[in-house]
């Protein structure tokens, strides 16, 4: 093998290794991304089961059912609602009519299996994603929560 061929071989090998490393990094990044959806987005789009995501909205009035450590409730953007099942301890500020962001996966039957529930921290705060979803659906009332 001549010197020129050897150099070309190492350059090609280096480019292949770099391409493989970039592919691994991109795969890791795409696996760790968590997309945000409103209940209307979930109802109007075909969301694949098992995909990790966040849903934001308000806890629908009269929808919270506690059964031991398992809690079932609905997250709504006033236009549509998504049933959520969560097993664990809820945040102290979790209650009906309050803003919430839940992280988890869609499951068969159209319910959302939450692994984490995040509640807003005071009556004036609305998570950015929830506020944008309410504005998009036309339910935003100048920073105040919509009436259900």
UniProtKB/Swiss-Prot annotation:
Q: Which residues cross the membrane?
A: 8-28
Q: Which residues lie on this side of the membrane: Periplasmic?
A: 29-148
Q: Which GO terms describe its biological process?
A: cytochrome complex assembly
The UniProt entry, under InterPro entries, shows:
CcmE, CcmE-like_sf, NA-bd_OB-fold
Pfam families referenced in this protein's UniProt entry, alphabetically? CcmE
Q: What is its main location?
A: membrane
* Binding positions for heme per the UniProt entry: 121, 125
- Tell me which UniProt keywords the record has, alphabetically: Cell inner membrane, Cell membrane, Cytochrome c-type biogenesis, Heme, Iron, Membrane, Metal-binding, Signal-anchor, Transmembrane, Transmembrane helix
Write down the membrane topology: Single-pass type II membrane protein
- Compartments it resides in: Cell inner membrane
Q: Does the keyword Calcium apply?
A: no
* A Gene Ontology term for the protein's cellular component: plasma membrane
Topology, Cytoplasmic side: 1-7
The answer to whether UniProt assigns keyword Protein transport to this entry is no
- The domain of life for this entry's organism is Bacteria
Gene Ontology molecular function terms on file = heme binding; metal ion binding
Which family does the similarity line name?
Answer: Belongs to the CcmE/CycJ family.
Q: What does this protein do?
A: Heme chaperone required for the biogenesis of c-type cytochromes. Transiently binds heme delivered by CcmC and transfers the heme to apo-cytochromes in a process facilitated by CcmF and CcmH.
Q: Which PANTHER family match?
A: CYTOCHROME C-TYPE BIOGENESIS PROTEIN CCME HOMOLOG, MITOCHONDRIAL (PTHR34128:SF2)
Q: What is this protein called?
A: Cytochrome c-type biogenesis protein CcmE
The organism's lineage is: Bacteria, Pseudomonadati, Pseudomonadota, Alphaproteobacteria, Rhodospirillales
């Amino acid at each position: 093998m001549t010197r020129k061929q050897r150099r070309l071989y190492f350059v090609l090998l280096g480019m292949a290794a770099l391409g493989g490393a970039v592919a691994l990094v991109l795969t890791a990044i795409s696996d760790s991304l968590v997309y945000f959806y409103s209940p209307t987005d979930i109802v109007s789009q075909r969301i694949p089961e098992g995909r990790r995501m966040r849903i934001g909205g308000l806890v629908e009035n009269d929808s919270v059912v506690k059964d031991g450590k398992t809690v079932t409730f609905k997250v709504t953007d006033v236009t549509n609602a998504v049933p959520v099942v969560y097993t664990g301890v809820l945040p102290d500020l979790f209650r009906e009519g309050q803003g919430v962001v839940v992280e988890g996966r869609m499951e068969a039957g159209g319910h959302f299996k939450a692994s984490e529930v995040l509640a807003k921290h005071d009556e004036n705060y609305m998570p950015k994603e929830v506020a944008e979803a309410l504005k998009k659906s036309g339910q935003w009332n100048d920073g105040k929560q919509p009436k259900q």
